[in-house]
A protein has these predicted regions:
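N-terminal small-domain helix-loop-helix segment of the aminotransferase-like
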Residues: 2-95, 102
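A secondary-structure boundary/capping signal
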Residues: 35-37, 117, 231-232
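Short glycine-rich anion-binding loops that position phosphate/pyrophosphate groups of nucleotides
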Residues: 37-39, 169-173, 234
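Conserved core of the PLP fold type I
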Residues: 60-188, 205-220, 227
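Residue-level marker for buried hydrophobic side chains located in beta-strands
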Residues: 169, 197-198
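Walker B catalytic acidic pair
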Residues: 201
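Active-site PLP attachment segment
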Residues: 218-238
């Protein structure tokens, strides 16, 4: 990707820029759009070339099973994160929010509590409420300008009606890259309260200074209650 070549996306039906005025009353010519995780750079040439190849086929029918796709994911996770993924364990959804909704609907019932470490990506609460589940806010503490988790306080909040916990790792919007010890504490929290753990790791390739650890590597003992979600969208701006 060429980070020295920003693209002017005004009047291209870009939600990031063309929706600034109607949503927030801010002239995009005068403001800086920071309300959505969407980069103003072209994706890698390999991505563009692959899309062009598919478009040039001229027929856009239903897409079938693609082993190369799963193998590419496995290779990336192995090279970048040291995680050996079983391709049979990969389930494709129409985006991370859709994947979250499917998890909520599959593993919980109406009225159940779903734990969020807040503040966090706003779509999680929307998905939970839309499914007639309850948002259980476990508030992150601020310590020297960074968010931290207080599991003594969170344990005291639980009443047994909670069935799921959603973690954002790395954290959105705080930017925290959780340590291995913190991830282990989240896993132990899920075990103590018999919760399905959904780990949103969509920003796993975009960290600065700290190293991201995939939850299955940090706490392999909870893989039977873990759903890890990620995507190529943030990494490659697609």
């Amino acid at each position: 990707m060429n980070f020295d070549k920003p693209i002017n996306r005004l009047n291209t039906h870009s939600a990031k820029w063309d929706m600034m005025k109607p949503l927030y009353g801010v002239d995009p010519e005068k403001g800086t759009s920071m309300w959505v995780a969407d980069m103003d750079f072209e994706p890698p040439v390999a991505v563009s070339d692959a899309l062009k190849t598919m478009a040039d086929q001229g027929v856009y029918g239903y897409y079938g099973n693609d082993g190369d796709y799963r193998n590419a994911i496995c290779g990336w996770m192995d090279r970048r994160h040291g995680w050996n993924v079983n391709p049979a364990h990969i389930f494709t959804t129409h985006g991370l929010v859709n994947g979250t909704a499917l998890c909520v609907q599959t593993f919980t019932e109406p009225g159940d509590g779903v734990v969020l470490f807040t503040p966090v990506y706003h779509a999680f609460a929307r998905v939970i409420s839309a499914a007639n589940r309850r948002v259980v806010e476990c508030k992150l503490a601020q310590n020297d300008g960074r968010y931290e988790m207080d599991f003594d306080a969170y344990d005291a909040q639980m009443d047994g009606s909670e069935k799921m916990v959603i973690l954002c790792s790395p954290h959105n919007p705080g930017g925290r890259v959780w340590t291995v010890d913190e991830l282990k504490q989240v896993a132990a929290f899920a075990q103590r309260h018999d919760l399905i753990l959904v780990s949103d790791e969509i920003h796993h390739d975009l960290t600065f200074g700290a190293k991201h650890t995939a939850m299955p590597l940090a706490a392999p003992e909870i893989t039977d209650r873990l759903v890890m979600m990620t995507a190529s969208t943030k990494t490659f701006n697609i």
